């Protein structure tokens, strides 16, 4: 039956006799509580909004196909990469970070870049951003980042003072802040930006040899960005500009593509690497660890229903497949818990049964989880009436030892180690990034920073100028000039191991 031919029913199939007139006592009288369709409709409506994501709330998504173009089987035995030309169905969700569901797409902000690959060995989620680094390297700061970039508890407004007080309280944040204040801080749309796995992951092959890897996704559409002025004009007329661009491009057959690359570092190279190779505030230089092409993905199908496929999409870095593994990256380790936990709160314990999250490459009929029950357990018959314990005499829930991973390298005793004693090289990489910019691009960094710091107190501005100066004197002087602050009035010699308590007041 076509959608047009369907007649109105309640959620349990009862025919609805009148959808416009409530049941009342007399033509003008009060409503009767026996108008079951009215009660059902309103109670359903009252509950139809689910909790929004704590970060990355405003998002757009599409389905597509990943195709292997180069052989990397010497690094990994993951079946998704097993042969050139192999294709895997996938889903991608892009997002802003700080804004709520109704936020404007063209804001200066990081963009989420989350990919879900439906492989024959289970779902692989790569939960990244459009930047290769992050503001900090210890997950204990996650909650504070959320509060600093979200709404102030007193005014209920976004507050630049909170943003910059937090960011400048962490000297290691300068690398990410520099990217955010650069031209790439406002992508023109979702199709014209790169993506990054950001974290360090690992791969292992049939011989159990492990290498550390970083994932890169380079847009085949080219990089295009917006100035602050261009973004303001777009926001004034279209708050959904990026979502509209992606949807309309796919709808008319202009399918966007990205090329997947990896950087590879051996375990021996990691031991001798200048910096901590698992530090999320730093990159691996391409001249030392060149990009290796892997494949490409194309987004070629829009969701039929936004709520079903985009709002209910659940990504978690714990969704990883044989041949791929984690690393000692503290931020990645923290996300291994927080993402799945957030999805269980937002969508329920059985969110894996929602169609967009199901392991399509395996087939829902072939999975055999030990979990049972819980709200909305509907898809797999709750494992039926079969054995629900282990060990048992029926061979159910037997392990698959052939998928055992190689030993994971660790080092040291459990302790709350001071990260600043381990590494205080905060400014080398943002300095190099700044020097890579053209003169015009540098000027835009200065101007964008001044625009973003409007209303911020002088002590926080001076703190940021000092960090910029340590990265490169020209950087610090340019930001100071844009902010109208005399560079000579700032103590530029504060020690590198400064902490929040030691900042000048």
Curated annotation (Swiss-Prot):
Inducing stimuli: Induced by hypochlorous acid. Positively regulated by the ferric uptake regulator (fur), in a Fe(2+) dependent manner. Negatively regulated by PerR.
GO MF assignments: catalase activity; heme binding; metal ion binding
Catalytic reaction list: 2 H2O2 = O2 + 2 H2O
Positions of the catalytic residues: 56, 129
GO terms under cellular component: cytoplasm
Cofactor: heme
Annotated stretches, region: Disordered: 1-25
InterPro entries recorded: Catalase, Catalase_3, Catalase_AS, Catalase_clade1/3, Catalase_core, Catalase_haem_BS, Catalase_immune_responsive, Catalase_sf
Entry EC no(s): 1.11.1.6
Keywords: Heme, Hydrogen peroxide, Iron, Metal-binding, Oxidoreductase, Peroxidase
Keyword Metal-binding among UniProt keywords: yes
Binding residues for heme: 339
Gene3D superfamilies referenced in this protein's UniProt entry, alphabetically: Catalase core domain (2.40.180.10)
Gene Ontology terms describing biological process: hydrogen peroxide catabolic process; response to hydrogen peroxide
Source superkingdom: Bacteria
Cross-referenced SUPFAM superfamilies: Heme-dependent catalase-like
Recorded family membership: Belongs to the catalase family.
Subunit structure: Homodimer.
Entry function: Decomposes hydrogen peroxide into water and oxygen; serves to protect cells from the toxic effects of hydrogen peroxide. Involved in resistance to paraquat when fur is absent and to tert-butyl hydroperoxide. Is important for survival under glucose starvation and desiccation conditions. Not required for virulence although is necessary for nasal colonization.
Protein name as catalogued: Catalase
Gene that encodes it: katA
């Amino acid at each position: 039956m076509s959608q047009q031919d369907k007649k109105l029913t309640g959620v349990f199939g009862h025919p609805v006799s009148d959808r416009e007139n409530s049941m009342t006592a007399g033509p003008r009288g009060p409503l009767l509580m026996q108008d079951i369709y009215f009660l059902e409709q309103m109670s359903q409506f009252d509950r139809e909004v689910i909790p929004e994501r704590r970060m990355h709330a405003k998002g757009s998504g599409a389905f597509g196909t990943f195709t292997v173009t180069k052989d990397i089987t010497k690094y990994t035995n993951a079946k998704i990469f097993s042969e050139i030309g192999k294709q895997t169905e996938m889903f991608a969700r892009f997002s802003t970070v700080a804004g709520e569901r109704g936020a404007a797409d063209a804001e200066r902000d990081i963009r989420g870049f989350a990919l879900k690959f439906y492989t024959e060995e289970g779902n692989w989620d790569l939960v990244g951003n459009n930047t290769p680094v992050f503001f900090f390297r210890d997950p204990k700061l996650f909650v504070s980042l959320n509060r600093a970039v979200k709404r102030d508890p007193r005014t209920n407004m976004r507050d630049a003072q909170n943003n910059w007080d937090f960011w400048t309280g962490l000297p290691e944040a300068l690398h990410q802040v520099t990217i955010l204040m650069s031209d790439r801080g406002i992508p023109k749309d979702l199709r014209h930006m790169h993506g990054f796995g950001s974290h360090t992951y690992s791969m292992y092959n049939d011989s159990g040899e492990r290498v550390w890897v970083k994932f890169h996704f380079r847009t085949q559409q080219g990089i295009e960005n917006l100035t602050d002025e261009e973004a303001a004009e777009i926001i004034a007329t279209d708050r959904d500009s990026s979502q509209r661009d992606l949807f309309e491009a796919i709808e008319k057959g202009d399918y966007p593509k990205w090329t997947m690359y990896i950087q590879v570092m051996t375990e021996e190279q990691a031991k001798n690497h200048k910096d901590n190779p698992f530090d999320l505030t730093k990159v691996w230089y391409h001249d030392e660890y060149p990009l290796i092409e892997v494949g490409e993905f194309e987004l070629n199908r829009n969701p039929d229903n936004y709520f079903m496929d985009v709002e209910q999409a659940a990504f978690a870095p714990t969704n990883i497949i044989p041949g791929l593994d984690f690393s000692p990256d503290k931020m990645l380790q923290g996300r291994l818990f927080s993402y799945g936990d957030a999805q269980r709160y937002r969508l329920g314990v059985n969110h894996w049964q929602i169609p967009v999250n199901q392991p399509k490459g395996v087939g829902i009929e072939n999975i055999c989880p030990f979990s049972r029950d819980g709200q909305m357990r509907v898809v797999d018959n709750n494992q039926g009436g079969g054995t629900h314990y282990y060990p048992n005499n029926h061979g159910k829930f037997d392990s698959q030892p052939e998928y055992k991973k190689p030993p994971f390298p660790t080092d040291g005793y459990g302790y709350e180690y001071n990260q600043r004693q381990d590494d205080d090289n905060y400014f080398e990489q943002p300095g190099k990034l700044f020097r890579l910019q053209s003169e015009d691009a540098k000027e835009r960094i200065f101007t964008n920073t001044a625009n973003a710091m409007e209303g911020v107190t002088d002590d926080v501005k001076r703190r940021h100028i000092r960090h910029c100066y340590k990265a490169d004197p020209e950087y610090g002087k340019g930001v100071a000039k844009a902010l109208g602050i005399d560079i000579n009035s700032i103590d530029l010699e504060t020690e590198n191991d400064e902490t929040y308590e030691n900042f000048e007041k």
